[in-house]
Amino acid sequence: RQMCIRDRYNDMQFFMLGSGDKEYESFMREAEARYKGRLCAYIGYNEELSHCVYAGADFLLMPSRFEPCGLSQMIAMRYGTLPIVRETGGLKDSVKPYNKFTGEGTGFSFADFNAHEMKDAMLLALDCYKNPVVMSSLVRQAMEADFSFDRSSEEYAMLYLWML
């Protein structure tokens, strides 16, 4: 039998903030009722609450099917919360996946939109959490990620020069 995340990490808590497909919202409400005290779902958006979540969380799970830019992962990194994202659009561009051989990365990612790959990314993140040295390094790298216009403008300037 394959061990599920909640069995392997029975002290983990999960907080969901946001909205989406109605079937997923219903699933989260049912899971909240089933796992009282371990899972909480806030369907909708609340700016003040979102900043409390960013500040208090260790990880941000963003399994988006499509995400042209995404700000949540960048805000989370600034707070020191490591994103776990699906490799799409702006999420792929802004989150550097953890490399266990070099120790580099600003979060965790998975390629395909399926539960198996998402679970594997979550398990890798949770294994890193158990190692304070690795976790501290990842948090620092995430907090130091540069999303400024300075970097973007340099890249555009180089592109324009190349085109000339």
Go through the PLM ranges and name each one.
Residues R6-R8, V85:
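Classical protein tyrosine phosphatase
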Residues R8, Y35, F101-G103:
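Short, structurally constrained coil/turn elements
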Residues Y42-Y45, S136-V139, E155-Y156:
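Short coil/turn segments at secondary-structure boundaries
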Residues K22-E23, E48, G90, H116, ...:
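Short alpha-helical
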Residues C52-V139, M143-E144:
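Catalytic binding pocket for nucleotide-activated donors in carbohydrate/polymer assembly enzymes
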Residues N10-C52:
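Nucleotide-activated donor-binding/catalytic signature segment of Leloir-type glycosyltransferases, i.e.
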Residues R1-I5:
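Short, small-residue-biased leader/transition segments that mark boundaries at the very start
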Residues F149-L164:
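C-terminal alpha-helical cap of glycosyltransferases
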